[in-house]
UniProtKB/Swiss-Prot annotation:
Protein source organism: Dictyoglomus turgidum (strain DSM 6724 / Z-1310)
Cofactor binding note from Swiss-Prot or TrEMBL: Binds 1 zinc ion.
Family of this protein: Belongs to the NrdR family.
GO biological process entries: negative regulation of DNA-templated transcription
Its biological purpose: Negatively regulates transcription of bacterial ribonucleotide reductase nrd genes and operons by binding to NrdR-boxes.
Needed co-factor(s): Zn(2+)
Name of the protein described by the UniProt record: Transcriptional repressor NrdR
HAMAP family the UniProt entry points to: NrdR (MF_00440)
Source organism superkingdom: Bacteria
Matching PROSITE patterns: ATP_CONE
NCBIfam families: transcriptional regulator NrdR
Record domain ATP-cone: where: 49-139
Gene expressing this chain: nrdR
Keyword rRNA processing listed: no
Matching Pfam families: ATP-cone, Zn_ribbon_NrdR
């Protein structure tokens, strides 16, 4: 690798470490010409996840869009963003483990509901009401009675 300080072509790797659950490799390098040290990072370039919408459109998975939906579900609940980020990380990991490059928004919604069910009942009901497009009080009552049975 070329030295960013003097442009010398051949640098040495002094230290190598895996970080972020072995998805990134950090290398500490030294230039034999100018003796400066610098750090480089190697990442696996992952194929983007495409989301198949209800109407059949496909769009790239948007982490921020999912985070916004989760944040709406947990408004005025004592749940910090770190927990929401962890949920999103788990969902992305689950999708990648399936080995698919496309997934329906419905499947993502199911995954979110499973995570929220364990996290907070109110957030679960809020998310379910939007995800399942509740249009009556009876639908809320049915969901609540199902939750009580479990």
């Amino acid at each position: 690798m070329r030295c960013p300080f003097c442009g010398y072509e051949d640098t040495f790797v002094i230290d190598t470490r895996e970080i972020e659950d072995q998805k990134v490799i950090r290398r500490r390098r030294e230039c034999p010409n100018c003796k400066n040290r610098f750090t480089t990072y190697e990442r696996i370039e992952e194929k983007p996840i495409m989301v198949i919408k209800k109407d059949g459109r496909r769009e790239p998975f948007d982490r921020n869009k999912l985070l916004a939906g989760l944040q709406r579900a947990v408004v005025k609940r004592n749940i910090d963003n770190e927990k929401l980020e962890a949920i999103i990380d788990e969902i992305i990991t689950n999708i990648r483990k399936q080995g698919v490059s496309e997934i329906t928004s419905k499947e993502i919604g199911k995954m979110v509901l499973e995570k929220l069910k364990d996290l907070d009942a109110v957030a679960y009901v809020r998310f379910a009401s939007v995800y399942q497009e509740f249009s009556s009080l009876e639908e809320f009552a049915k969901l609540l009675s199902q939750m009580k049975e479990e």
